[in-house]
Amino acid sequence: MQLSDRPLTAPGTAPRQATVSRRTGETDVQVFLNLDGTGRCQADTGIPFLDHMFDQIASHGLIDLEITAKGDLHIDDHHTNEDVGITFGLALAEALGDRKGIVRFGHFVAPLDEALVQVALDFSGRPHLTYGLTLPTERVGTYETQLVREFFVAIANNAKLTLHLRQLDGINSHHIIEATFKAFARSLRMATEVDPRRAGQIPSSKGVL
């Protein structure tokens, strides 16, 4: 049974989940996510390192994810990496809906051995990425490290969030990237939590996001 076939929310609660498909001449991507999950993940993007990073998002963000992608990997990973980020961002936006009642802001500092990365985000409705990672190698395995920035640009633009990634320490590319994804996951979990004191209100003094 697929994750998307299972009852993933408590009885009487509105499901904060989405299924988004996106097909282009270069890729075919499907993303299912449940913001109120338990950290289950089934990711098959054709890019093993990216699948590993989605495991981190699911596990540390307590998001249930089901992701499949078929792309022109015979050329390189760029199109698939970006389009998976786009589709994931669209699914986040759909699952959040009008964003009523959420905390909105999230931040976390994650260590992984010598690496230390800070992430702060705001579901502001204003897409922005400040990227402050310095990755010392061009690849981790077969994954091009320059694709990390493209992945987060795609998420920020399509989930309409403001995202800051700041590397505080680190010399190992794998550790830096994984710490970034873990910190992003925890920030995402914080920002998307429902604040009972909001009572379904838009978390903005303007009344709109």
Swiss-Prot record:
The keyword Transmembrane does not apply. Keywords: Amino-acid biosynthesis, Cytoplasm, Histidine biosynthesis, Lyase. It is found in: Cytoplasm. GO terms for molecular function: imidazoleglycerol-phosphate dehydratase activity. It catalyses: D-erythro-1-(imidazol-4-yl)glycerol 3-phosphate = 3-(imidazol-4-yl)-2-oxopropyl phosphate + H2O. Its EC number is 4.2.1.19. It holds the Pfam family IGPD. PROSITE patterns: IGP_DEHYDRATASE_1 (PS00954), IGP_DEHYDRATASE_2 (PS00955). Pathway: Amino-acid biosynthesis; L-histidine biosynthesis; L-histidine from 5-phospho-alpha-D-ribose 1-diphosphate: step 6/9. It comes from the Bacteria. Residues 1-23 are annotated as: Disordered. InterPro entries: IGPD_sf, ImidazoleglycerolP_deHydtase, ImidazoleglycerP_deHydtase_CS, Ribosomal_Su5_D2-typ_SF. One of its GO terms (biological process) is L-histidine biosynthetic process. One of its GO terms (cellular component) is cytoplasm. Belongs to the imidazoleglycerol-phosphate dehydratase family. HAMAP family: HisB. This is Imidazoleglycerol-phosphate dehydratase. It comes from Synechococcus elongatus (strain ATCC 33912 / PCC 7942 / FACHB-805) (Anacystis nidulans R2). The gene is hisB.
